[in-house]
Regions:
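Positively charged n-region of N-terminal signal peptides that target proteins for export
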Residues: 1-5
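Hydrophobic h-region of N-terminal signal peptides that target proteins for export
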Residues: 9-17
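A ubiquitous, low-specificity "background" feature that marks scattered single residues
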Residues: 8-9, 297
Length: 298
């Protein structure tokens, strides 16, 4: 369930005003309240629609479905809250408020584990889906930082199903930051969802690190931050992995595990090869793979 920015802002401010040193837990609890409030609001709207059904049986069925959906939504809120609190146990109590100084950015994205050189295209395949990621010459200024725009498109059986622009920048220490995305999901050529869109500096969104300059085993960090929309987390779980994909054999790969409180059961392992970048994604539950097939250019 995506919680509205206004509800989140009001509840986080209200809870924070009562004090407490643990900003992470305070945030998790406030978001849980916002999630439950939104679920109940949607339930009341559903009941209002049910009331306008003249047929008694249809009305009762509508009310029963609304109640079931409320129960499911509240359980989802609870599961997400537990996942956020588990993350807090590792992230610590401090507010998430990274200092972004534009003067500390400006060079090329040449981190050996995630080089994003304009003109480079990466082609991935997994099952019926293919993914083409192109590092463009376009730049976008966000929070005063000039970001590289990456165009990422996903096809399912040849049909375009997702079209995304991602924005990245590297600081002078070599960390690669993620500043947001403009994403569209499509069906039959029509946009059906823009869920997941966020831009650092807008509605409380903040950038996160997608690749550290010197990753260490056990590192646990935020990759993005917009409560209720973008909450990906990553943990470094391997430093010297070997990977075989259609694009070749790669040694010395970094392995990370990505999770998000928005989908508590989802876990994805990613492998990054020196000098190449992302070469493999593996669903930790199903074992399904998205593999690098080809690197073109620059």
């Amino acid at each position: 369930m995506k919680t509205s920015v206004l509800v989140l802002a009001l509840l986080v401010c209200a809870v924070t005003a009562r004090g407490g040193a643990d900003a992470c837990k305070t945030t998790a609890k406030a978001v849980a309240k916002a999630c439950a409030a939104e679920a109940k609001a949607e339930y009341m709207l559903a009941l209002a629609n049910c009331a306008n059904l003249a047929d008694s049986d249809q009305r009762k069925a509508c009310q029963a479905e609304a109640k079931a959906q409320l129960k499911e939504a509240l359980q989802e809120c609870k599961d997400q809250a537990e996942a956020r609190l588990e993350a807090c146990a590792r992230l610590g109590p401090d507010p998430y408020d990274p200092v972004i100084n534009p003067a500390n950015f400006g060079g090329p994205i040449n981190n050996p584990l995630l080089p994003l050189i304009p003109g480079t295209t990466y082609v991935y395949v997994g099952g019926s889906e293919s993914n083409v990621m192109t590092v463009t010459d376009t730049t976008v200024v966000i929070l005063g930082v000039t970001c590289v725009e990456v165009h990422d498109v996903v096809y399912d059986d040849g049909e375009l199903v997702e079209d995304t622009l991602d924005w990245y920048a590297q600081d002078n220490q070599g960390n690669v930051w993620y500043f947001g995305e403009n994403t569209h999901e499509l069906e039959d050529g029509l946009i059906v969802s823009i869920e997941g869109q966020w831009t650092a500096g807008v509605d409380g969104a903040k950038p996160g690190i997608v690749m550290k300059a010197n990753p260490m085993l056990g590192d646990f960090y935020r990759q993005e931050f917009l409560l209720g929309t973008a909450e990906d987390l990553a943990e470094v779980t391997g430093l010297n992995e070997s990977v075989d994909v259609p694009a070749g054999h790669f040694d010395g790969c970094l392995k990370t595990r990505e999770t998000t409180p928005l989908e508590p059961d989802a876990m994805e392992d990613k492998f990054y090869a020196p000098g190449v970048g992302l070469v493999l994604e593996v669903d930790a539950e199903t074992g399904s793979r998205v593999e690098l097939v080809q690197v073109i250019g620059p």
